[in-house]
Amino acid sequence: PMPMIAVQLLWLNLVANGFQDVALAFEPKEGGELSVKPRSPHEPVFDKHIIEHVLVVGSWMGLVAFLNFQWTLDQGQSIEEARNLTLMLMVLFGNIHALNSRSESRSLFKISLFRNPFLMLAVPLAQLAHIGAMYTPGLSDVLQIQPISVAEWLQLLALAMSLLAVE
């Protein structure tokens, strides 16, 4: 079975990318830009380092999400519940990835969270949009999602935080 249905993928693109992508455009400069050697005009925009990073991070998120989906099914949960948890995990991954994508060279832990107030508003807003959808009749039915337990929240948060070790 597929880990997510089409409408869930569309929703994921909205809540895991929509708010955060716009907010990242307001990320202040890091400083020291003038001391960095200019990139050659013949160098591709997506160099080896960026391609490698995208492959590693994307593979990690996909692998963890799929293994959690399969584990949920193996525990006797329904396909709908497994998809519900997979979607929440991917929303959490998107928020953590947005926070950690603020710099190419510095970790999330070395940059003040409040340097970009737009992102600090966008991340909780995206998460609240998804949580709100879980509790909204009609929308929760279309997305085939439902509220999750505290234990499930903790499990998904731990899995999503593993992304910080990979990035």
Model-derived segments and their meaning:
Residues 1-167:
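C-terminal transmembrane helices and immediately adjacent loops/tails
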